[in-house]
């Protein structure tokens, strides 16, 4: 006989599925608002930012319109309270937005982070 206590079914880990894109099941722990912000940031980064970043590296330019677009979408100042013009979202939401922009370009993610945290 084993001296180890048996796990109750509710305490046993779910070994039935593994999602390599979300190994820690972060998505299950997010609020609806956090998921919406993440998805909006991902769509912007993939659909609007990525092609312009490729062109910017090739042509050695920066497109100032990107900063305005990110601001209009609320991607700058995610955690700043609404009464000051931000979204008033959580730091988890900020991290999710930063991760989606980082997937496309580290430079724009850095710019976004600086402008988002300047109020601290």
Cite the ranges covered by each PLM segment.
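Structural signal for hydrophobic packing residues in well-ordered secondary-structure cores
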Residues: 41, 45-53, 101-108
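A common structural microfeature
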Residues: 27, 46, 53, 67, ...
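Conserved active-site and cofactor/substrate-binding residues in soluble primary-metabolism enzymes
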Residues: 36, 61, 65, 92, ...
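Mature N-terminal segment immediately following signal peptide/propeptide cleavage
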Residues: 28-48
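Internal helix-loop-helix
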Residues: 72-118
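Short secondary-structure junction/hinge motifs that connect adjacent elements
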Residues: 51-72
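Intrinsic disorder at enzyme termini
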Residues: 1-33
